[in-house]
Regions:
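Short, charged, surface-exposed secondary-structure boundary motifs
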Residues: 161-162, 212-215
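Extreme N-terminal starter segment of soluble prokaryotic enzymes
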Residues: 1-3
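Alpha-helix capping/helix-boundary segments
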Residues: 123, 189-190
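Helix-loop-beta element that forms the nucleotide-linked donor phosphate-binding surface
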Residues: 191-209
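A short beta-strand/loop micro-motif in the catalytic core of glycosyltransferases
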Residues: 180-186
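Aromatic- and Gly/Pro-rich donor/ligand-binding loops
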Residues: 5-14, 18-175
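Alpha-helix N-cap/helix-start capping motif
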Residues: 21, 187-188
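Single conserved hydrophobic/aromatic residue that forms the stacking wall/gate
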Residues: 216-224
Length: 224
């Protein structure tokens, strides 16, 4: 079958890469073709808060700190060094890691599929301020072109029923979730939210990184 995975495959961190890789390899080892599917990044429901001190600190005041405060200069240097290190990591991720997943610069939206798997990772964590994710109905199956729609080890992360109510998304997400053919989650919070919004008891699954290790890696001699 032609199976798509919609996950956090473009988010630049180790965990997102490993879970995407683990799920892709597990499905491929079952004899299927796998394509990563992109979601459209929307505006976050939550605005990232900036402290008033940081927001209104004048340029002149920051310059005075640089000139007269050794601790500030040290912290500033560490911040610049960290920024350079992260920039190098992003370059490596884009040019070496994403090709391992088969992910290119070209975005893939709503392809024709036999099955679309949404997950794993915090694909349902919609009340966060991350601009790389935002609020995206596609992560809840909206506008998909697959014959079957399922999740694997999906998570709401820090999102709760109370937060969905606060931002007026409870009904919309409930209706979208009811269109899934099967739902599995990886944590109790996500299990409870699915049960509350859909009256469906989702399957509790392990993270695909752990699944891949259990299925396809041999124990070391010390574990024998």
């Amino acid at each position: 079958m032609n199976i798509g995975i919609m996950s956090m495959q473009r988010i630049i961190n180790y965990g997102s890469f490993l879970q995407a890789y683990g799920l892709k390899k597990t499905i491929q080892n079952m004899g299927h073709t796998v394509t990563f599917v992109d979601y459209r990044v929307g505006k976050p429901l939550v605005s990232e808060s900036i402290s008033s001190n940081q927001k209104f600190e004048s340029k002149f005041k920051r310059m005075m700190k640089v000139f007269f405060s050794p601790p500030y200069r040290m912290n500033r240097k560490q911040s610049i060094d960290s920024s350079k290190a992260f920039s190098n990591f992003c370059h490596t991720f884009q040019n070496e890691w994403l090709p391992i997943l088969g992910v290119t610069d070209e975005r893939v939206y709503s392809p024709k599929l036999d099955v679309l798997v949404i997950g794993s990772d915090e694909v349902f964590n919609c009340t966060q301020s991350n601009l790389d994710v935002g609020y995206s109905p596609q992560l809840f199956g909206y506008e998909n072109s697959a014959e079957k729609l399922i999740t694997y080890a999906a998570s709401f992360g820090s999102t709760t029923i109370e937060k969905l109510d606060k931002y007026g998304k409870t009904t919309e997400i409930s209706n979208l979730l009811k269109e899934f053919d099967a739902i599995s989650v990886r944590d109790k919070n996500s299990h409870d939210i699915i049960k509350t919004l859909t009256a469906i008891y989702p399957i509790d699954s392990i993270d695909p990184v752990l699944l891949y290790c259990l299925l396809y890696t041999s124990p070391s001699p010390r574990d024998s």
